[in-house]
Amino acid sequence: MKLYNTMSMQKEEFVPIEPGKVRMYACGPTVYNYIHVGNARPIIMFDVLRRYLEYRGYEVTFVQNFTDVDDKIIKRANEEGISSEEVAKKYIAEYFTDAHALGVREATVHPKATENIQQIIDLITTLIDKGYAYEVNGDVYYRTLKFRDYGKLSHQPIEDLQSGARIDVNDIKENPLDFALWKAAKPGEPYWDSPWGKGRPGWHIECSAMSNRYLGKTIDIHCGGSDLAFPHHENEIAQSEAANGCKFVNYWLHNGFINIDNKKMSKSLGNFFTVREAAAVYGYDCIRMFMLMSHYRSPLNYSGEILMQAKAALERLRTAKSNLEFFIANGRDGELSEADAAFVQGLDQYREKFDAVMDDDFNTADAISVIFEMVREINTAVSPAADPSKTLAQACLDRFLELCDVLGIPFGSDSSEDPEAKVIEEKIAARQAARKAKNWAEADCIRDELKAAGIVLEDTPQGVKWKRA
């Protein structure tokens, strides 16, 4: 399995620190608003990476944090007339509502910055003791020039960064590149007691402290959006490696941006749609499929046309699943014939192709193409004309769902638990009864009623199949 490492700018063979186990960290949201579609991309794509690693047999410890103390949260609290804690609590709950609807599994641990204040203070103290940080008037800053590898992730020499840094004549920092580890308390802001007085942590130190606490000094994979590579991840490296004296991360993974009109979708530019807004139009399932149909490192353009393409692709997969379920219920009885057994064994080629493209930097776009190849072959073998057995249909469904589950392809609720599906089945049964009684007018009336509701019927020797138009 190969992963593209931002640090080396090339694909590298994935070798975990501990055989059979993976320690993985993803930077989570700053919880002051609903997540937008751009925020959802790393959440979905690194959920897929975690799923694939587990499918390959790894035991994955996945940590995704919440930044629950920050200038933006404080600003939102002031606007809404509530505490920062209440803002964070509200939007963490909203995050999980959206994430669950997107088919994203919860991380092993979802730590909050405010639950790790002592770990943050301890890490800052270590950096001060080692000469990598200094205190000024209750603020603590990282001494960037002391860490000579600064800029190695973003591939920017420290000299270039220094010459391009903005100089503030009133700056109390030793160097314009220095960044805050601890911020002295201001009136009306949340604070904690520390050796440097009352204050709160800076953003960058939070992730270093939480990663260190829950995953250890060196971890396998750290992932996030491309916009986090500099300065956030660069600063994490400086903090963690200076404090611990060892390599922080073995594989750095960054997803590409989602663009609108060739500009990155972001709250700061105001050109964003929340996941909830997009889901109201296209559905959460469609948003996930939209993400899966592109390689995670490629830029992705957000448009109604592309989302509708994703919706159509998802519907094709759902139709394939319902077709197999139909023949599991209505196909011939009996064991697999010799020819059927050979056919099922032949489907293993698609798992091999799927594994090959996913092993190549978890290429979900190519993986979905492989699944569609499999579907085309299955649809030929499991069709009314082929008169398939229930056993063959079940074997095909098992192999189809195994690959779909790795990507978290959303099929919606089970039709047996879908109230609308039950009503449709009842109407189909009533139509069948009318046909049996040769009441053709009533049978046609029921068919027309279902058609008007967007339900298409197909009469087959095995029974009546239906799908949504």
Residue locations for each model-derived region?
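Short phosphate-binding/catalytic loops that engage adenosine nucleotides
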Residues: 58, 132, 455
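Short catalytic-loop micro-motif centered on adjacent basic/acidic residues
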Residues: 108-111, 222-224, 390
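N-terminal, positively charged nucleic-acid-binding surface of large information/translation enzymes
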Residues: 8-13, 17-105, 462-466
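Alpha-helical recognition segments enriched in aromatics with Gly/Pro capping
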Residues: 1-32, 47, 97, 118-325
